[in-house]
């Protein structure tokens, strides 16, 4: 019995360690890419130097009740900011448990683009801490200004509004780093520097 509890604790801690976020508030992000599975084109690329928008991404799992509860609130945020320089994205993992991407959008009447993040889990692994829902806001320069699990609508709205205060200039990340490097390289460097690899 004691060995079982020890195994469960070790397993839980290893899962938490494996899902430690790579990017933290204050880090600069370059381009993000993904596949849109609903409410948009197939391929999505967000470049802070080109788009110069605030980006809000919510990472979720379809089977988790808190993610289901927040879906309509994200739609409200999307409608509140859709005519401003804000891009709102959902990033789903674990599709078909119980909803497919299309069923998710239909069930919760969502009109913002939804990424299929289940294969590479780029969004989930870059920003999350192993807990969903996980929400991030990145300002117009590519700086991560909000990163938190759970759902705190007013904090997210405040972060989005704060993101507008950043001037529309070239990303500091790209000025400081090699423009040919990508997030995968940055991801590997950060993991190594933090002792994960």
Language model region names:
Residues 56-57, 88, 135:
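Hydrophobic beta-strand anchors of alpha/beta hydrolase catalytic cores
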Residues 21-36, 165-197:
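Non-globular targeting/processing and membrane-anchoring segments
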Residues 107-110, 118-162:
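Thiol/disulfide oxidoreductase modules built on the thioredoxin-like
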Residues 72, 79-122, 129-132:
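Conserved segment of the thioredoxin-like fold in thiol-based oxidoreductases
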Residues 31-54:
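A short beta-strand-turn-helix
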Residues 53-55, 59-63, 131:
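Short pre-active-site segment immediately N-terminal to redox-active cysteine/selenocysteine motifs
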Residues 59-76:
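Conserved redox-active cysteine motifs that mediate thiol-disulfide chemistry
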Residues 1-24:
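Bacterial Sec-dependent N-terminal signal peptides
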């Amino acid at each position: 019995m004691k060995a079982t509890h020890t195994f469960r604790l070790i397993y839980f801690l290893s899962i938490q360690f494996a899902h430690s976020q790579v990017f933290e508030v204050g880090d600069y992000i370059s381009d993000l890419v993904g596949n849109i599975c609903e409410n948009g084109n197939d391929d999505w690329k967000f470049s802070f130097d080109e788009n110069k928008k605030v980006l809000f991404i919510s990472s979720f799992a379809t089977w988790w009740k808190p993610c289901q509860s927040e879906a309509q609130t994200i739609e409200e945020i999307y409608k509140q900011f859709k005519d401003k320089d804000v891009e709102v994205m959902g990033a789903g993992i674990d599709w078909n448990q119980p909803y497919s991407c299309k069923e998710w959008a239909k069930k919760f009447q969502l009109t913002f683009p939804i990424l299929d993040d289940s294969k590479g889990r780029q969004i989930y692994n870059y920003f999350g801490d192993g807990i969903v829902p996980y929400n991030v806001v990145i300002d117009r320069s590519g700086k991560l200004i909000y990163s938190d699990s759970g759902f705190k609508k007013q904090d997210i709205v405040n972060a989005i509004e704060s993101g507008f205060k950043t001037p529309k200039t070239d990303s500091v990340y790209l000025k400081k780093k090699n423009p040919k490097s990508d997030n995968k390289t940055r991801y590997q460097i950060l993991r190594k520097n933090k002792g994960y690899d």
